UniProtKB/Swiss-Prot annotation:
It comes from Anaeromyxobacter dehalogenans (strain 2CP-1 / ATCC BAA-258). Transmembrane segments: none annotated. Keywords: ATP synthesis, Cell inner membrane, Cell membrane, CF(1), Hydrogen ion transport, Ion transport, Membrane, Transport. This is ATP synthase subunit delta. The keyword Cell inner membrane applies. NCBIfam families: ATP_synt_delta (TIGR01145), PRK05758.2-2 (NF004402).
Length: 179
C-alpha cells in the first residue's frame, strides 16, 4: 500500500511536468525504455542503489545511460532521484502509474490480449479495432502468449473480459454434457 502511494506521488509529479511541457507521450516512451534497461541489468540496479557509490558516481552513470538511451533530462532524473533516495524498487510502479495517467490523459485504453500463439500484426490490429469499437476509445494492446488456451484469444480491457478461447469453449461444453 505504501509503495503504491509513494509511486503515485512520483508519477503524478513527473506527469504534471510532462503535461505542462507538452511531453506526455515522449516521456511515457522514455520511461518504458528506462524501466526495461534497469530491469534488464542487475549491475545497473546495484550501482544505483548501493551506497558504496557516491552521488557523483551514480549521477555520472545515470547521465551516461541517459545519453546512450537518448533520454531527456527529466525522465533520466527520475532514475537518479529514486536511486539517491533508496527507492529504486519503486521505478516499475512509478513508470506503470505514469503510463496509466498518460493513457487516461490521451483518451486511450490498454487491453491485455492473450492468445495460444503469437499474433501477427494484422490479427492484432483487427482485435484492437474491434475492442476500440466496443469501448468507444482507442485501444492499445499488450500481448501475451499462453499455449494452454489451445486456440482463440482472451482480451481484458479494465474489468471486462472477452473470452474467445478454445479452452473455455471446451470447458463450457464439458459442463453442459455433464448436466
Amino acid at each position: 500500500m505504501l509503495m503504491g502511494s509513494i509511486a503515485r506521488r512520483y508519477a503524478r509529479a513527473l506527469f504534471s511536468l510532462a503535461v505542462e511541457q507538452g511531453r506526455v507521450e515522449p516521456w511515457n516512451d522514455a520511461l518504458q525504455v528506462l524501466k526495461n534497461a534497469v530491469e534488464g541489468s542487475p549491475d545497473l540496479r546495484d550501482v544505483l542503489s548501493n551506497p558504496v557509490y557516491s552521488k557523483e558516481q551514480r549521477r555520472a552513470i545515470v547521465e551516461k545511460l541517459a545519453s546512450a538511451l537518448k533520454l531527456e533530462r527529466e525522465p533520466a532524473n527520475l532514475l537518479f532521484l529514486l536511486g539517491d533516495r533508496n527507492r529504486l524498487a519503486y521505478l516499475a510502479a512509478v513508470v506503470d502509474t505514469f503510463r496509466s495517467l498518460a493513457d487516461q490523459h490521451l483518451g486511450r485504453l490498454r487491453a491485455r490480449v492473450t492468445s495460444a500463439v503469437p499474433l501477427d500484426a494484422s490479427a492484432a490490429q483487427a482485435i484492437a479495432d474491434r475492442l476500440s469499437k466496443a469501448t468507444n476509445a482507442k485501444v492499445l494492446l499488450d500481448r501475451a502468449v499462453d499455449p494452454s488456451l489451445l486456440g482463440g484469444v482472451i482480451a481484458q480491457v479494465g474489468s471486462l473480459v472477452y473470452d474467445g478461447s478454445v479452452r473455455t469453449q471446451l470447458e463450457d461444453l464439458r459442463k453442459t454434457l455433464k448436466q
